[in-house]
Amino acid sequence: MQASQPEVWHGTTILTVRKGGKVVIGGDGQVSIGQTVIKSNAKKVRKLGKGDVIGGFAGATADAFTLFERLESKLEQYPGQLTRAAVELAKDWRTDRYLRRLEAMMLVADKDVSLVLTGTGDVLEPEAGVMAIGSGGNYALSAARALIDSDKDAETIVRRSLDIAADICVYTNRNLTIETLSTD
């Protein structure tokens, strides 16, 4: 790597599962720069707004917190309308000169809907209530899809799937943060 090139930040796996009257978002705690783990217990999943929305992020931490703050502002403008708030955030994210340079992805959920938001303006609802982002996202997604029809509850599926991702992805660890909402 040339000295003029910044190190690439790697890390995280965020997964959401909606099943059995619950929606769960979980994520690992590892943050790496280059080949070095610089933090193992980062909290990348949290409650938003008045606690009726949960979210997780993959990407640059400062960028993600900026986007969480913007989403909370949109949720205040459009209370109880996560999809509308997410679409409005995505519009801003894509068109605002400052925001469009932010490098992060977000998974957010309320009692009715789960969404992934990207800097390219995408607001996507997962198939079968399962979606993942981040470096270990494909591994966690595959594991969760394999487990979704089992008798396991949503939180168990999230925990097991993130453990499987941690077995495979060097940028994912087992220091998990899990948030749950009732969908009833």
UniProtKB/Swiss-Prot annotation:
Allosterically activated by HslU binding. It comes from Nitrobacter hamburgensis (strain DSM 10229 / NCIMB 13809 / X14). It catalyses: ATP-dependent cleavage of peptide bonds with broad specificity. This is ATP-dependent protease subunit HslV. GO terms for cellular component: HslUV protease complex; proteasome core complex. InterPro entries: ATP-dep_Prtase_HsIV_su (IPR022281), Ntn_hydrolases_N (IPR029055), Proteasome_sua/b (IPR001353), Proteasome_suB-type (IPR023333). Its main location: cytoplasm. It comes from the Bacteria. Its EC number is 3.4.25.2. One of its GO terms (biological process) is proteolysis involved in protein catabolic process. The active site is at T12. Belongs to the peptidase T1B family. HslV subfamily. PANTHER family: ATP-DEPENDENT PROTEASE SUBUNIT HSLV, METALLOPROTEASE TLDD. It is found in: Cytoplasm. Protease subunit of a proteasome-like degradation complex believed to be a general protein degrading machinery. Na(+) binds at A166, C169, T172. Keywords: Allosteric enzyme, Cytoplasm, Hydrolase, Metal-binding, Protease, Sodium, Threonine protease. One of its GO terms (molecular function) is metal ion binding.
